[in-house]
Amino acid sequence: MRNIIVKKLDVEPIEERPTEIVERKGLGHPDSICDGIAESVSRALCKMYMEKFGTILHHNTDQVELVGGHAYPKFGGGVMVSPIYILLSGRATMEILDKEKNEVIKLPVGTTAVKAAKEYLKKVLRNVDVDKDVIIDCRIGQGSMDLVDVFERQKNEVPLANDTSFGVGYAPLSTTERLVLETERFLNSDELKNEIPAVGEDIKVMGLREGKKITLTIAMAVVDRYVKNIEEYKEVIEKVRKKVEDLAKKIADGYEVEIHINTADDYERESVYLTVTGTSAEMGDDGSVGRGNRVNGLITPFRPMSMEAASGKNPVNHVGKIYNILANLIANDIAKLEGVKECYVRILSQIGKPINEPKALDIEIITEDSYDIKDIEPKAKEIANKWLDNIMEVQKMIVEGKVTTF
């Protein structure tokens, strides 16, 4: 029998607390660029391994570093003078022994990784010439033999945990969390870019809620070629402000929402957040995997969080990735139950044990006033057991890109 613990949590729900802080680093932020590349490389390797061998081989590509380039932005269009440098690191199965033929088969790990990284950058950074403005250096090496052995022992079985680690998830998102998340997603949507192409991809949204007032502070790169002067820059800022105000009315009805964009700008000196490429990575701002958003897309100091860098870790047995995603999936389903205000889930693994048999799966529930936790407990356990029984579905969701890791 699995060790699933369900208990009532006697604390104020997040919406009833006096303050709340929420952050999201957008797709063009250097840290998020690294997260996105790491995950894209992992998915590409999964597909390559599956095509060649019908199974996913050992890999972890969660070590991506970005070193900022050098640019000279100016109204009407500036220039990149030094490229952005991206290091792909980590470990992967680069060769296997064909026992029937008694020969070593070399696998195209490096070329697969570089191709995946380039394709991701071209998709996300609309104003970057990836072939000219970016150097991609692949240094992915062969995996550790003991961890490869854990992989080998689990073929045709439920995978064995590669580490003793934990995952954390909660649901539902608060109004502030949804507003922060959806603001960045909207500003980086095709719809918005087509209407206001000057908006770059490097967007950071910080939300502060004080009672029924939410203050959004948005750092938003503006692409220089689309603005001829400071007046056109101001117009872009005001257009975006109006768009975010309209979005806030839909998401945060009943709240006073105050919006600040690029608060470090000095219009008199014409010192503003102007970029050539739409990302601060062009000008010395560096990035790493795992320094930004958690798997639910947010940084939430008022909620439980794991410090695990999920992006790029293998989706087969790396519990640091799987359990964080799984915890959120379980929490979301439990939060839909009648009588549940909030749900918090923590899952602990034990290295070498099947990942569908965690050492502990802890569920904390804030209930509606008239509901007893004893009535909710069996349903919550049923949901947790169902997800654990179908844990291989989580692997599939990750490989197909159906769940986010940042």
Swiss-Prot record:
Protein keywords: ATP-binding, Magnesium, Nucleotide-binding, One-carbon metabolism, Transferase
Chain sites annotated for binding ATP: G141, Q142, G143, S144, M145, D146
Gene3D superfamilies for this protein: 3.30.300.10, S-adenosylmethionine synthetase, C-terminal domain
Keyword ATP-binding included in the entry's annotation: yes
Catalytic activity: L-methionine + ATP + H2O = S-adenosyl-L-methionine + phosphate + diphosphate
Cofactor: Mg(2+)
This protein's pathway: Amino-acid biosynthesis; S-adenosyl-L-methionine biosynthesis; S-adenosyl-L-methionine from L-methionine: step 1/1
Record-listed E.C. numbers: 2.5.1.6
Pfam families: AdoMet_Synthase
Assembly and oligomerization: Homodimer.
Function: Catalyzes the formation of S-adenosylmethionine from methionine and ATP.
Family as reported in the entry's similarity comment: Belongs to the AdoMet synthase 2 family.
NCBIfam families, A to Z: PRK04439.1-3, PRK04439.1-5
Protein name: S-adenosylmethionine synthase
Originating species: Methanocaldococcus jannaschii (strain ATCC 43067 / DSM 2661 / JAL-1 / JCM 10045 / NBRC 100440)
Gene name per UniProt: mat
